[in-house]
Design a protein with these regions (language model features):
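Hydrophobic alpha-helical segments at protein termini of multi-pass membrane proteins
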Residues: 1-337
Length: 337
């Protein structure tokens, strides 16, 4: 007999699951991006620069959306996911920009930016997932990744634009460097942080039609905000560590620039810092998903055991067989049904 789970009870898998369109799109989009760069360089046509920005900024985040579409279940439609990506991305960067407009430079700047941006994405995730059924940690992680991908795409487009515009004209090399770095890091940046928050938020509401407040949601929000702040401040942290570890006095920094002798050390520490933050984020997400998976299996096992306890082995005349446990016939309580 097939056991009905929460996911199969709410419509099951979508018919377009597991078709591998995400990696096909990633590969073909990358080829289009390369061809666009070659044509731009060969023709010196600056009208193609926006195409490079859009392809480079949206390719990886939109691939994340396709990855989610092939795995999401329940009442979530493809249109809802695409809307969450585009509308959520636009509203996310606008809301974050408004919250960050009054922030002043200081030691806590990056941390405050992390709290502001994760708050905006969290609120958007609540709006997007309000009517989603079933609410499970896995569903929340997938929807959170979609909202985070939309935010990442529009934010990356802004960074790429700023990198391209200089006093000397369009700096194509700086533009491409910015796009490559942000494209490679986007899955372990905004996508990962919002996926963690979504997994905890939806996991807390498991089996319920509405979201449920628990302290774990607040803890998750603080954790992803701190990870976000550490990620953004990694450049400053790695620079300070380079001075401390090499014993170089801070006075050696002229006009706020790092001495050339420390360039390699700073780069190494920067990459190591990003790797550490990424590993912590992935470990947190995997831990949350495994915790809720075990919890779901325990609940399902208890439900099966409770329902089975009301079954009475009967003989051919509707009378319990000899030796069978005598069980009073009565209506089981509502929580068993």
């Amino acid at each position: 007999m097939r056991t009905m789970t929460l996911e199969t009870a709410h419509g099951g898998a979508h018919p377009h699951h597991r078709h591998g369109w995400w990696w096909k799109t990633l590969l073909s989009g990358f080829l289009l991006w390369v061809v666009t760069i070659v044509v731009t360089v060969a023709t010196q046509n600056t009208n193609l620069v926006p195409t490079i920005i859009l392809l480079g900024s949206f390719l990886v985040p939109f691939t994340v959306v396709l990855f989610v579409i092939e795995r999401v279940t329940g009442t979530v439609s493809t249109m809802q996911l695409v809307t969450a990506f585009f509308v959520g991305g636009v509203l996310g960067v606008l809301g974050a920009s408004l919250l960050e407009s009054d922030l002043r430079p200081g030691a806590t700047l990056y941390l405050l930016v992390g709290f502001a941006e994760e708050l905006v994405k969290g609120l958007l995730l609540v709006v997007v997932g309000w009517r989603v059924r079933p609410k499970t940690a896995r569903q929340g992680a997938l929807l959170g990744a979609t909202v985070g991908a939309g935010f990442s795409a529009f934010e990356s487009a802004g960074y790429a634009f700023n990198a391209a515009i200089t006093t000397r004209g369009i700096d194509l090399v700086s533009l491409l460097q910015t796009e490559v770095v942000r494209a490679v890091l986007s899955p372990v940046g905004h996508v990962l942080w919002t996926a963690i928050l979504g997994a905890v938020l939806f996991g807390a509401a498991h089996g319920r039609p509405r979201f449920r407040w628990t302290w774990s949601v607040l803890v998750a929000y603080v954790v992803v905000s701190v990870l976000h702040g550490l990620w953004d401040s990694n450049s400053t942290i790695s620079t300070l560590l380079a001075f401390v570890l090499t014993g170089t006095p801070f006075s050696a920094a002229q006009d706020g620039t790092v001495p050339p002798a420390l360039g390699g050390v700073v780069t190494t520490l920067y990459v190591a810092g990003l790797a550490v933050v990424s590993v912590i984020g992935v470990a947190v997400l995997v831990g949350v998903l495994l915790h809720h998976r075990r919890r779901t299996r325990q609940i399902e096992a208890q439900q099966v055991a409770a329902v089975g306890s009301w079954q009475v082995p009967a003989g051919p005349w509707g009378v319990p067989d000899d030796g069978a446990e005598q069980v009073w016939h009565r209506t089981p309580p509502p929580h068993v049904l």
